Amino acid sequence: VATLDGKSAYADADFVVIAAPTNYDPVKNYFDTTHVEEVIDLVLAVNPNAVMIIKSTIPVGYTRSLYLRYARQGVKQFNLLFSPEFLRESKALYDNLYPSRIIVGYPKQMNHPDFADEDQAIASIADVDRLRQAAGTFAALLVEGAIGNGEPFTFDGPLPIADGVCPREKTKGIPVLGMGMKEAEAVKLFANTYLAL
């Protein structure tokens, strides 16, 4: 059932895909992530157990900063992934059916002093093993919805993306990669930069 009521839409959801606009603000020299954060706040209020997947274009480091922000706000559980989309202008349907790659970023410990606060926040409010599994499940759903090379695909659980590239014989020939969220954000940035050239 289609609805414009976020509360009813998110109440029983396992996954909430956030594809809100993030317009570039030339004054701030930054993406306006206000709408993404509004969705996150509503999901946390209605269904904090749901896994949220950001598909919007966001700055590098944004998702890890959200873990830090929500940990400081006292949130007990925060389930956030990032899965960039690689859609060309006027080719969105084709690019969804025949994706050049599927990437799902999940929270990983960076184990470096510069990221100690973020690592601690992630450890305190995220079940990293559950989110790694959820990333594999979401990747499998994206493969299931794609045509790829036309090979049959049977959803039988999460794809094994935790250690990098999933074997292509499991993914209709589509490269499927799991990585840290900051890495996934950087891949999206580099792809956008390349397409802008």
Q: Predicted regions span which residues?
A:
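Structural/interface elements that position substrates and couple domains in central-metabolism enzymes
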Residues: V1-L197
